Regions:
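Active-site loop of classical SDR/Rossmann-like NAD(P)-dependent oxidoreductases
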Residues: 19, 41, 284-298
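Contiguous beta-strand/loop segments that form the cofactor/metal-binding neighborhood of enzyme cores
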Residues: 189-262, 294-308, 325
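C-terminal helix-rich "cap/oligomerization" subdomain common to oxidoreductases
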Residues: 1-2, 71-74, 224, 299-332
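Predominantly a Rossmann-like dinucleotide-binding segment in NAD(P)-dependent oxidoreductases
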Residues: 130-209
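Rossmann-fold dehydrogenase core element
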Residues: 110-130, 150-154
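Hydrophobic residues in well-ordered beta-strands that form the structural core
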Residues: 98-99, 124-126, 258
Length: 332
């Protein structure tokens, strides 16, 4: 990678696009060069906001050509990820891409993007930021140490109250991709990170709206070693104004319970230990949203600077879409 500052562009200026724009803009090695937003109203607004910042505002990604970009962030709706990324590659605009979760609308699209990305030979990443949580990271560290013995089973959940009280006629969940793509994908990725590749074995329950989009779902899965686990995902769970993700892991010598903010270790001998987020050096250089977002962006930048593929590459992240497709196939 070149010695000069990395030149970044961002496509899609919704909540996530603005978050990533703010974060990369404070990383010294990055220069935010251009933003792409198709909405005429938003385009005019951002031209006023960034008029003195030297950032180019465009309404078509074709206008990214000639800007000598090192990487582009794709933060458009999930349904457009595949077409936008393919266009970036086909037009030779950029080789390095960060895309918000999920990689694509389904596993077939994800496989196609992986194949194209291999041919382009760039660096790519998908935004499963929970892997950058100090709490979940500590849980994985404890698991790998081996002091808990053999991992026997796990439970995983992802809850929010976003659609609590809405009727089945509401299409709000569908507009965000459904509970699996919008919410459950994060805890599925955490499980893949902790336990390896998973195969769905059964769908226990599913609630869908009239658009056919799941609002809550429960399913079981297992890995090649025979480890079994259960997932519960809901966008209409009471008491979760902010989304929460959690895992419980039962081992032969104890168990781990972890969510976004705290971790507990309980040994069969009766010994207990607890950690909270603030106990685990959660500080970052710039805080916006959650600290995980800064670490995620810094990891992408560092991968570009050192010319190494990200752990959360298209290839690895496509396995989340693989699991989601299995669940949807069984629940249809």
């Amino acid at each position: 990678m070149k010695d000069k500052r990395l030149r970044f562009g961002i496509i899609g200026l919704g909540k996530m696009g603005l978050l990533h724009a703010s974060l990369v803009n404070v990383i010294p090695e990055v220069e935010l060069v251009a933003l792409c937003e198709k909405s005429a109203l938003m385009n005019r607004l951002f031209k006023k906001v960034f008029s003195t910042a030297g950032i180019k505002i465009v309404d078509d990604l074709e206008k990214f050509r000639g800007l000598d970009l090192d990487a582009v962030y794709v933060t458009t709706p999930i349904s457009s990820h595949s077409s936008v990324i393919k266009e970036l590659f086909a037009r030779g605009i950029v080789r390095n891409v960060f895309v918000e979760k999920t990689l694509a609308l389904n596993y077939e699209q994800s496989k196609e993007l992986c194949a194209i990305a291999r041919n382009v030979s760039g660096i790519n990443m998908v935004g499963y930021m929970k892997r950058f949580s100090v709490v979940f990271g500590k849980a994985k560290e404890l698991l790998l140490q081996g002091d808990l013995g053999e991992l026997q089973k796990f439970e995983a959940y992802a809850y929010s109250s976003d659609f609590l009280g809405l009727t089945k006629k509401s299409k709000s969940s569908a507009s965000r991709g459904g509970a699996l793509s919008d919410l459950g994908c994060h805890v599925i990725d955490l499980a893949l990170w902790m336990f390896g590749q998973l195969e769905v074995t059964d769908v226990l329950s599913a609630e869908k709206n009239e658009a056919g989009s799941e609002t809550s779902i429960a399913f079981t899965a297992s890995n090649s070693s025979g480890l079994t686990g259960q997932f519960e995902i809901s966008q209409s769970m009471k008491g979760y104004r902010m989304p929460e993700f959690g895992l419980s892991m039962e081992c032969s010598k104890g168990r781990i319970d972890v969510n976004d903010d705290r971790l507990s270790l309980t040994l069969n001998t009766g010994i207990q230990r607890r950690w909270h987020r603030h106990d685990l050096n959660d500080a970052v250089n710039f805080y916006l949203g959650d600290s995980e977002y800064y670490r995620e962006n810094f990891e992408f930048v560092n991968s570009l600077l050192t010319n190494r593929q990200c752990e959360l590459s298209f290839e690895n992240a496509s396995m989340v879409d693989y699991v989601i497709d299995q669940v949807r196939s069984r629940s249809s």
